[in-house]
Amino acid sequence: MLPLLLASSSTYRRELLSRLRLPFVCSSPDIDESHRPDESAIELVKRLAEQKARALADSHPAHLIIGSDQVAVLGERIIGKPHTFENAREQLMAASGASVTFLTGLALLNSQTGHCQVDCVPFTVHMRVLDQARVERYLRAEQPYDCAGSFKAEGLGVSLFQSTEGPDATSLIGLPLIRLIDMLLAEGVQIP
């Protein structure tokens, strides 16, 4: 088996990948993550996932490189990481009683052959009706400013959910393991 490389510095993605009990290393790619004009959210996450994997191919010429990228979509609007309390409060209040779809782009690049599998896995969160006091309590408790959508699904953020739907709950945290396993199996990786 070629060595696995996770093209990410995300602790969340690292924790998810470790569930597969396969050895891997991590490296952070340096790419331009800006949204192109007329690019759909699905096209954006697929492109960025593949770019992250390809950015490390030259320095890791015989690896299976995993790239992933995620955006949250509320209505027609892409919402990213809030970075601040104020932005997070605004995002959560806008999502109150609504549905937020998380689109996770996934790429698996065999840097030896150049073959790259790319996909997008959606996951939808139906939010509870939230008031400002509840949102502010949550934000002070968890400070999810580095998370698209302004909550941590693996933590207290689940208290904001009414329900969820999608093919793979791990995609909500940023690395869709079910689809990744399909890709790894196609590359001949044995799991377990």
UniProtKB/Swiss-Prot annotation:
One of the protein's GO biological processes: nucleotide metabolic process
InterPro entries: ITPase-like_fam, Maf-like
Molecular-function GO terms, alphabetical: nucleoside triphosphate diphosphatase activity
Catalytically driven reaction(s): N(7)-methyl-GTP + H2O = N(7)-methyl-GMP + diphosphate + H(+)
Entry EC number(s): 3.6.1.-
Cofactor(s) for this UniProt protein: a divalent metal cation
Domain of life (superkingdom): Bacteria
Active site: D69 (proton acceptor)
Intracellular or extracellular location(s): Cytoplasm
GO cellular component terms given for this protein: cytoplasm
Key words of the record: Cytoplasm, Hydrolase, Nucleotide metabolism
Positions of the record's site feature: Important for substrate specificity: Y12, Q70, E154
Main localisation: cytoplasm
Function (record text): Nucleoside triphosphate pyrophosphatase that hydrolyzes 7-methyl-GTP (m(7)GTP). May have a dual role in cell division arrest and in preventing the incorporation of modified nucleotides into cellular nucleic acids.
PANTHER family for this protein: 7-METHYL-GTP PYROPHOSPHATASE, BIFUNCTIONAL DTTP/UTP PYROPHOSPHATASE/METHYLTRANSFERASE PROTEIN-RELATED
Family: Belongs to the Maf family. YceF subfamily.
HAMAP family: Maf
Protein name according to UniProt: 7-methyl-GTP pyrophosphatase
Organism name: Pseudomonas fluorescens (strain Pf0-1)
UniProt lineage: Bacteria, Pseudomonadati, Pseudomonadota, Gammaproteobacteria, Pseudomonadales
